[in-house]
């Protein structure tokens, strides 16, 4: 019996020092207006460089701060903000919960996505599933499988090395 094994992988993976400087040239292939979703700290770390890189290519952006857990209800709420913003693609920034929620927007809308991790203690950028929780943080007994892959992952090693908390760095190394 022949079995077809289907794997959805990432379209493009870039890992280098100052990779964030390339965000604009990668994003221009995805759209003209970005909806950027990330945690408070992650957005503080990347916002200025990301905004400048996007602006160089004429890409506007709207930022939204992620809080809480990646739940179906939270995904629906951020999807509404994405649709209201008029953006045509998503940029997820930060750790696993924020990235999974950004992927959830694309799951709902079929929009393109770029992921920018700020911690190595997660694999959400590359994983083709969205791990879901209840709003109180309890895990749901199921996950959503992505219909389309993440388009671009930008891993800026300068951010990972200099800005990532040591506990997250050691957790990520141990997890690998």
Language-model segment annotations:
Residues 1-89:
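ATP/NTP phosphate-donor binding region
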Residues 11, 107-176:
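A glycine/threonine-rich phosphate-anchoring loop and its flanking beta-alpha core
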Residues 20-21, 42-47, 97-104, 122-126:
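Short glycine/serine/threonine-rich phosphate/pyrophosphate-binding segments
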Residues 42, 69-71, 97, 120, ...:
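Glycine-/small-residue-rich active-site loops that bind phosphorylated ligands and cofactors
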Residues 49-52, 78, 105-108, 128-131:
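Short, glycine/charged-enriched secondary-structure capping and boundary segments
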Residues 65-70, 93-95, 122, 143-149:
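Short C-terminal domain-edge/linker segments immediately following a structured domain
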Residues 82-120:
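A short, small-residue-rich loop immediately preceding and capping a beta-strand
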């Amino acid at each position: 019996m022949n079995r077809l094994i289907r794997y959805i992988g990432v379209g493009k993976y870039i890992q280098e020092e100052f990779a964030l400087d390339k965000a604009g040239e990668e994003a221009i292939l995805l759209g003209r207006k970005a909806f950027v979703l990330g945690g408070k700290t992650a957005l503080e770390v990347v916002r200025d460089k990301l905004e400048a890189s996007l602006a160089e290519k004429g890409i506007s952006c709207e930022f939204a701060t992620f809080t809480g857990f990646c739940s179906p209800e939270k995904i629906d709420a951020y999807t509404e903000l994405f649709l209201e913003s008029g953006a045509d693609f998503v940029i997820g920034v930060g750790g696993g919960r924020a990235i999974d929620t950004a992927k959830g927007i694309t799951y709902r809308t079929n929009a393109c996505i770029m992921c920018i991790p700020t911690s190595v203690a997660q694999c959400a950028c590359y994983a083709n599933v969205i791990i879901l929780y209840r709003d109180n943080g309890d895990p749901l007994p199921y996950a959503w499988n992505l219909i389309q892959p993440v388009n671009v992952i930008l891993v800026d090693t300068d951010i990972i090395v200099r800005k990532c908390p040591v506990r997250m760095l050691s957790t990520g190394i141990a997890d690998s």
